[in-house]
From Swiss-Prot:
Chief site of localization: membrane
Name assigned to this protein: Lipoprotein LpqB
Similarity comment: Belongs to the LpqB lipoprotein family.
Keyword Transit peptide: no
Lipid moiety-binding residues (N-palmitoyl cysteine): 30
Localisation per UniProt entry: Cell membrane
Lineage: Bacteria, Bacillati, Actinomycetota, Actinomycetes, Micrococcales
Length: 570
C-alpha cells in the first residue's frame, strides 16, 4: 500500500486561499463570464446579490493522467457546480457519471491534511471534515477531529484512467466552500403565525439554480430538528409546477402546483411573505402563480404581519442598587408597574418579555414570575436551579444544574409542566435560553468529556404550554469553559467561556452556519443579546457591564447586580 499527498492538493489550497483574499485575483484567475444563454438585466447590487455568478473553472482530465491525478482532479473539479458538475463528471466512467449524485452531501474539510492511499486500482482519500452539508442544505459542524475515509475505484476507459466507483456528494475545502456555496435563509412561521422563524441552508452560489433550490426547500419544509416547532403557510403537497424559478428584473416568478389552490386569501398572503423573505437575497419581489395563473395577492395588514427577528432596546435593562430598569448613562429608568416588584426580590438573573409587563426572576428564594398586574408568583423552589429562561407566552423555564432532563415550564397558574427533553450525553446544564420567537431553545450542557452546545425546537400543547423539545442538534462550543449562552438574533447564539484565569472568549455562531470567535472582557460572567451596534453585552463578576468596541471592551456601568435578557421591545 502506498500513501501520498499529491501536489494538486497544495496547489488547489493556495488557489482557494487566494480567492478569499482577493476578489481581483478571483475574477482574473477563477471566475468566468457566462458564454451562453440569454442576456440578463442586472438588479441593483445593494438590494439583490444574485446577478453575479462566480464559478471555479477546474481543469478537465489531462491525457495520460495517473490514477492519483484523476482522483485529485475529480475532487477539485467537484467544487464547481456549473452545468450540473459537468467537468467533475468527465473524471468518471460514463455509467458512474450518470449515476453520481453530487447533491447528496458536501464534506467541508480543512484542505490541509488530505492523504491518498491505494491498493491496486482501489484508492482511498482521508479528509479532516470541519462541517457537513446534507441533501437539504443544512450545515452541521463536525466536532470530531478524526479523519474520514472516502473510497474510489478506477478502471481504464478508452485508454485513460477514469473513476468507476465514487461516493455521492462532493468534498470542498473550507475557503473554497465559502466562495462557491452561499448561505440562504429560509423562513417558516411560529405555530400562531406571529413570527417568521429563520432556517439557514447552504446551496451552490449560482443564479440559475439558487432561486429554484430555495423555493423547493421552502416547499419541502423545515430542517428536521424544527419539525413541529414551526409551520409553513403552504398547503400539504404543494410543489413547483415547473422545476425552475426564474428571476428577471429582480422579480422571482414561482409557479405552484394545483395543491396550492386550496389556500384562502390569508393563507396566500402568508405564502407570499414566506417566499419573499426566503428569496430576499435573490429577488426584490415574488410573483406567485398556480398552474400558470398569476395570483393577485394584497399585502397583509400590519396587525396580521408576522414579526421577523424582533429587535431589543439599545439600552440594557439592569438591576443596579435598589433600582431596576432601562440604563441610560448612569440613570436607571423604571419600567412602569414592574421595576419595584423585580427590585424587591434582589434579583441575580432576569428575563423581561417584549411587552415589559412580565419578567422571570431568579433570587435567593427561587424563581419567580413577576407581573405588572397581580402578585409575584414563586414558580420554582428546587435547589440548584440555573438562571431561568422565559418566553413571550409567559412561561418560565427552570431546571436544576445537575438534572438537565428535569426541565419544567410554569405559567400564571403556578402549575409546573414537565418539558420532555433528551440531551444526549448530558450530565448537567450550565445555561439555557429561549429564542425571542419562542420556537427554539439553546443550552450549554456538561458531559462526561467536557461541554456541549445544543439547540432544539419547542413543541407546545393546548394553551401554548411547552411539552417537549425536538431531538437537538449540536453546535460548536468554542474554547474554554462555557458559562453563559444568549440569543443575539433570530439565527445566532453567543457563548461566553472562561479561557484562562480571568480571561474569557466569546464564540458567536449562526445556527446552521459558521462560527466567529473574539476575546471577551476580563472576569466575564453573563452574556445577553443587545440592540444597537453591539450584538451582545457582558456582565462581569465585579459588577461592571461591558460592551464590545472596535479595539476591546468598554465599561457601560458599574455596581450592576444583574443584566436582563430582553425578548423584544414594545
Amino acid at each position: 500500500m502506498t500513501r501520498r499527498s499529491g501536489p494538486a492538493v497544495a496547489r488547489y489550497r493556495v488557489v482557494a486561499a487566494a480567492l478569499v483574499a482577493s476578489l481581483v485575483v478571483l475574477l482574473a484567475a477563477c471566475a468566468s463570464i457566462p458564454d451562453s444563454g440569454p442576456v440578463r438585466q442586472g438588479g441593483p447590487i445593494a438590494q439583490v446579490s444574485d446577478q453575479l455568478d462566480l464559478d471555479f473553472n477546474p481543469s478537465p482530465p489531462e491525457k495520460g493522467a495517473s490514477p492519483q491525478r484523476i482522483v485529485q482532479g475529480f475532487i477539485d473539479a467537484a467544487s464547481s457546480p456549473k452545468n450540473n458538475f459537468q467537468i467533475a463528471r468527465e473524471y468518471l466512467t460514463r455509467p458512474m457519471g450518470a449515476a453520481w449524485n453530487p447533491d447528496e452531501s458536501v464534506t467541508v474539510d480543512d484542505g490541509r491534511n488530505r492523504t491518498y492511499d491505494h491498493d491496486g486500482n482501489q484508492w482511498s482519500v482521508d479528509v479532516s471534515p470541519v462541517a457537513n452539508v446534507d441533501s437539504t442544505g443544512v450545515y452541521h459542524p463536525v466536532l470530531s477531529k478524526a479523519p474520514v475515509g472516502l473510497s474510489y475505484e478506477l478502471v481504464r476507459q478508452d485508454g485513460e484512467w477514469r473513476i468507476s466507483v465514487a461516493p455521492n456528494g462532493v468534498v470542498v475545502d473550507d475557503p473554497t466552500f465559502r466562495s462557491v456555496y452561499s448561505q440562504q435563509t429560509l423562513y417558516f412561521y411560529s405555530p400562531g403565525f406571529g413570527y417568521l422563524v429563520p432556517d439557514a441552508r447552504w446551496f451552490p452560489a449560482r443564479v440559475a439554480a439558487a432561486a429554484t433550490r430555495v423555493a423547493s426547500a421552502v416547499l419541502a419544509g423545515p430542517a428536521k430538528w424544527l419539525n413541529g416547532a414551526v409551520v409553513s403557510a403552504f398547503p400539504q403537497g404543494a410543489q413547483l409546477a415547473v422545476p425552475s424559478v426564474t428571476t428577471n428584473g429582480g422579480v422571482a416568478r414561482v409557479d405552484l402546483s394545483s395543491e396550492a389552490a386550496q389556500a384562502d386569501q390569508a393563507q396566500l398572503q402568508r405564502m407570499q411573505v414566506q417566499l419573499e423573505q426566503s428569496l430576499a437575497s435573490l429577488a426584490r419581489s415574488v410573483e406567485l402563480s398556480i398552474e400558470g395563473n398569476v395570483q393577485q395577492i394584497p399585502p397583509l395588514n400590519d396587525a396580521a404581519a408576522a414579526l421577523q427577528d424582533p429587535p431589543v432596546d439599545s439600552h440594557p435593562i439592569v438591576s443596579r442598587g435598589d433600582s431596576f430598569g432601562l440604563l441610560n448613562g448612569s440613570t436607571v429608568t423604571a419600567l412602569s408597574g414592574l421595576s419595584d416588584r423585580v427590585a424587591a426580590l434582589q434579583p441575580t438573573a432576569v428575563t423581561v418579555n417584549a411587552a415589559r409587563d412580565q419578567a422571570a426572576v431568579l433570587s435567593a428564594a427561587g424563581a419567580f414570575l413577576v407581573r405588572r398586574s397581580g402578585e409575584s408568583l414563586r414558580v420554582e423552589a428546587r435547589p440548584g436551579i440555573i438562571a431561568p429562561a422565559f418566553d413571550n407566552d409567559g412561561w418560565v423555564w427552570t431546571v436544576p444544574a445537575d438534572s438537565p432532563a428535569a426541565l419544567q415550564a410554569t405559567g400564571a397558574t403556578g402549575e409546573p409542566h414537565l418539558v420532555k427533553a433528551d440531551w444526549p450525553g448530558a450530565t448537567g446544564i450550565v445555561s439555557l435560553a429561549v429564542s425571542r420567537d419562542g420556537t427554539r431553545v439553546v443550552a450549554v450542557l456538561r458531559t462526561a468529556s467536557g461541554y456541549s452546545l445544543a439547540v432544539a425546537g419547542v413543541l407546545r400543547g393546548s394553551g401554548g404550554v411547552p411539552t417537549e423539545l425536538t431531538a437537538p442538534i449540536e453546535l460548536a462550543v468554542g474554547e474554554g469553559e462555557p458559562v453563559s449562552v444568549a440569543w443575539t438574533s433570530g439565527l445566532a447564539v453567543a457563548v461566553l467561556s472562561v479561557t484562562n484565569g480571568d480571561a474569557t472568549g466569546i464564540s458567536e455562531q449562526t445556527i446552521g452556519g459558521t462560527m466567529t470567535t473574539t476575546t471577551g472582557p476580563a472576569l466575564g460572567g453573563v452574556i445577553v443579546g443587545a440592540g444597537g451596534l453591539s450584538h451582545y453585552l457582558v456582565l462581569a463578576t465585579d459588577g461592571t457591564l461591558q460592551a464590545p468596541t472596535g479595539t476591546g471592551w468598554q465599561t457601560q456601568a458599574d455596581k450592576v447586580g444583574a443584566v436582563a435578557v430582553q425578548l423584544g421591545q414594545p
